[in-house]
């Protein structure tokens, strides 16, 4: 199976191939599978960008999308994730896109199901397609990753985006810095160095902001939104510290006036909405890879038709 579970399981050449494929889709080259293919999106956590961009990518590729709503499914009757995926496999689904609150939920599935699994986010663990779209956005801007300084600011401990990006950016030759409240530092993330926020922003080629993951916190945040913004947010004053040519990224949803001043969301250095656009092309590339690796009765479906 051509699963996409974490980027750490892909070689750098595989990652670059996905980015190249995404650029091909961005440039307007249409594709569709040689035979009908079916995909289901299983989102057990709320999502706007990831879910909608996967659905857009699936339709652009001519895939048949099977509706699935956990709140109206047998999950409410106690059905396990494994049995849900096996059910979809049994009725003919070829790939599943899954977002789940449990870290590494896919370990119970990867060797036990006959469909391609695409991880759309697992708890605090990984978010591979978000990292890919971030990489594509950075590459479009700078042409390379080697030697860049990427600063990730905010709720590092609870962020799957921070974990995924720090690992892959380090492998690609970037220098990763972290900044944020000390109580939200992630001792398990060894792919970056913690620095004070003003220093981080002044050194950055890429300023990547993270929202506060309230839903993953055992205790309520000790700061008000206004206090957080002043101490750890990208304020209008801090933005003046950015180098010429530095860019702002955010995986969204954006909490304006908390992690970033509202005026900066669509300011000249911001690539936040470009990230969202790139998400469709990246997910098209990921879905294409998943379907190409799909085993059907011992036959790997690899042939895709180019639509002239």
UniProtKB/Swiss-Prot annotation:
Keywords: Pyrimidine biosynthesis, Transferase. Its EC number is 2.1.3.2. The keyword Transferase applies. It comes from the Bacteria. It catalyses: carbamoyl phosphate + L-aspartate = N-carbamoyl-L-aspartate + phosphate + H(+). Gene3D superfamilies: Aspartate/ornithine carbamoyltransferase. Pathway: Pyrimidine metabolism; UMP biosynthesis via de novo pathway; (S)-dihydroorotate from bicarbonate: step 2/3. GO terms for biological process: 'de novo' pyrimidine nucleobase biosynthetic process; 'de novo' UMP biosynthetic process; amino acid metabolic process. It is an enzyme of class 2 (transferase). The keyword Glycoprotein does not apply. One of its GO terms (cellular component) is cytosol. One of its GO terms (molecular function) is aspartate carbamoyltransferase activity. Disulfide bonds: none annotated. Belongs to the aspartate/ornithine carbamoyltransferase superfamily. ATCase family. Heterododecamer (2C3:3R2) of six catalytic PyrB chains organized as two trimers (C3), and six regulatory PyrI chains organized as three dimers (R2). HAMAP family: Asp_carb_tr (MF_00001). NCBIfam families: asp_carb_tr (TIGR00670), PRK00856.1 (NF002032). Catalyzes the condensation of carbamoyl phosphate and aspartate to form carbamoyl aspartate and inorganic phosphate, the committed step in the de novo pyrimidine nucleotide biosynthesis pathway. This is Aspartate carbamoyltransferase catalytic subunit. It comes from Geobacillus thermodenitrificans (strain NG80-2). The gene is pyrB.
